[in-house]
Amino acid sequence: MPIPARTAALGGSSIALKDDDINTAFQNPALLSEKTSNSISGSYINFLGSVNYGYLSYGKSFKNIGHFAAGLQDVGYGTISARDEYGNQTGTFTGNDYNFSLMYAYDHDSLLSYGVTVKTLYSKYAQYSSVGNAIDAGITYNKASKLFCLSAVMQNVGKEWKTYTGGPQEKLPFNILLGASKKFKRAPFRLIATYDYLNIWNLTYTDPNNPTPTVDPFTNQPIKTTPVKNFFDKLGRHFIVATEVVVTKNFFVRLGFNYKMREELSLPDKKGLAGLSGGFGFKINRFNFSYAFTRPTPGYSMNSLTVGANFGKYTKAPKPLVMPL
């Protein structure tokens, strides 16, 4: 879940945006830099019903050592009714997922940086709980003079140590991503593209009860397909494309498209704006604000809000000189 609003507005990925936004390190730790030092940020999403997402982060750089950050992600599912096999309510319980992250990045030179994130994962539903650890690693090539950034990220290398019921340990969703962004000197926008799940070719959801469907379950019509159509459908599910329009140096408009989200969450006869996202951001002195509007499925919209501040880059105005009489 792309909690930071800027990431949500850009379709769910921001692994190749190296600037003063500490939230981009949520997906790629190599994006930490001196510009994110002394930055603090908080994000919030009100999801379906009483489900709420939150994320807090803080970054600090140390000369000749590197760039550090810490983040805490929380998914709260509210109060849920507990029922027996006959549907009778037996009480209530709560559910939460937590992710505590420690991030580090180092600048190899003026162009190349690399970073690592160590995540501690904790999940609890009623009396059932699970604990795990995972590592993310990223490398970024940033050519500031050409306004070009290229990144590769490996996510969720880890293990579940404690399972909910004492059964077999579950695998973590390992992912390899490639991303690039390019801003044009004479145009007020940057183009952003991410290739998701480089390690898995076929991301199409397969129903275990009907692994090779020939009839559309909603329309009852035969599914017409060709090898070429299948290829481009599978290829499209890997790509997230977006643009960020730089209206002024302190105001931005964002738009993203996630084909995989559109195909998985839309209805066959009503796709609407599923998979589209958009938003804006602006800065006032040391503070920055971002808002995102995401349409994961027809009939439902998700709103994201991020508020942050960078205390390292803010300096007070000098005192006026007093001329001696």
Feature locations, PLM:
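Subset of outer-membrane beta-barrel
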Residues: M1-L325
